[in-house]
Curated annotation (Swiss-Prot):
Active site: C118
Molecular function as annotated in GO: peptide-methionine (R)-S-oxide reductase activity
Record keywords: Oxidoreductase
Catalytic activity: L-methionyl-[protein] + [thioredoxin]-disulfide + H2O = L-methionyl-(R)-S-oxide-[protein] + [thioredoxin]-dithiol
InterPro entries referenced in this protein's UniProt entry, alphabetically: Met_Sox_Rdtase_MsrB (IPR028427), Met_Sox_Rdtase_MsrB_dom (IPR002579), Mss4-like_sf (IPR011057)
A GO cellular component annotation in the UniProt record: cytoplasm
Identification of the protein by name: Peptide methionine sulfoxide reductase MsrB
Gene name of the record: msrB
């Protein structure tokens, strides 16, 4: 992502969006936009707009954050060891904008790969299926057909 474009986009973020994506903060569980979203669509990086997750892979993990079994394209996320807060975790970041997204844990549904991508709503923008074409994401309609 072009640095000037990224800087312009960062200026448009809310405080929570900026703190989550740029400072690796975590939003409060059960008090965020998408933890209980059941609409069909895709979730894109709030900074770059790159598609990251699909509602087809979303499930209620009971943790208070949107949870997914996998990203749409594994090449769009990168994982790093995270030793903050006295824990050993795996941080998930977006490749394009280097946004902190959340963490991935090995306690997801076993029949779907066993992973739980626990992602901050503040790092995402949701595009409903009926808006995919209008928003320029028409190639992703096929995953809902």
């Amino acid at each position: 992502m072009d640095e000037s474009k990224k800087n312009e986009r960062l200026k448009q973020l809310t405080d929570i969006q900026y703190n989550v994506t740029q400072k690796a903060d975590t939003e409060r569980p059960f008090q965020n936009e998408f933890y209980d979203n059941v609409a069909k669509g895709i979730y894109v990086d709030i900074v770059s707009g790159k598609p990251l997750f699909s509602s087809n892979d979303q499930y209620d993990a009971g943790c208070g954050w949107p949870s997914f079994t996998k990203p749409i394209d594994e090449a769009e996320v990168i994982e790093h060891r995270d030793l903050s807060h006295g824990m050993i975790r795996t941080e998930v970041k977006s490749v394009e904008a280097d946004s902190h997204l959340g963490h991935v844990f090995p306690d997801g549904p076993q029949d779907q790969g066993g992973l739980r991508y626990c992602i901050n709503s503040a790092a995402l923008r949701f595009i409903p299926v009926d808006k995919l074409e209008e928003e320029g994401y028409q190639t992703y309609k096929k995953i809902f057909e």
